[in-house]
């Protein structure tokens, strides 16, 4: 798999931060408004969302006027799904387990305790039918989901008492 080609495609398709040059507007560039579930400059997740948006603008070579909004700047963090689903913005960057209230299946497209490792998850998405399931689920809300990174397998939990049974 060509990593650069994949990253370029994911960046152009998925979306996130910074304003494109005014020349993009003058050239008739398409507006791409991206909202995030994370605060601006939040280490790791927030800063990577900003970098992704900047890269989309750069790789689009004037085709996109990219406008990025961190959590709370355009909509609240947990309103980003509905913002994009309604058509008010074109993309969001977040973790799909935030949307389990809409459908519990969204958890499987992020990370769950004791779940798959990042390589296992990527293999399932690309080769094991995961993307097709994700397309079906996200498509029912008018969205197209794309993987834009991974924080890895989530921990099983932190408890103040020893667990001795499933109960």
Language-model-detected regions and their locations in the chain:
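N-terminal export signals
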Residues: 5-26
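Short helix-initiation/N-cap motifs at beta->coil->alpha
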Residues: 68-82, 151
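Generic structural signal for residues in well-ordered beta-strands
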Residues: 66-68, 145
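Immediate post-signal peptide segment of exported/extracytoplasmic ligand-binding proteins
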Residues: 19-37, 57-65, 139, 161-167
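Alpha-to-beta junction loops
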Residues: 62-64, 80-94
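Contiguous mixed-secondary-structure segments that line small-molecule binding/active-site clefts
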Residues: 54, 95-167
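Extracytoplasmic "Venus flytrap"
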Residues: 33-51, 71-76
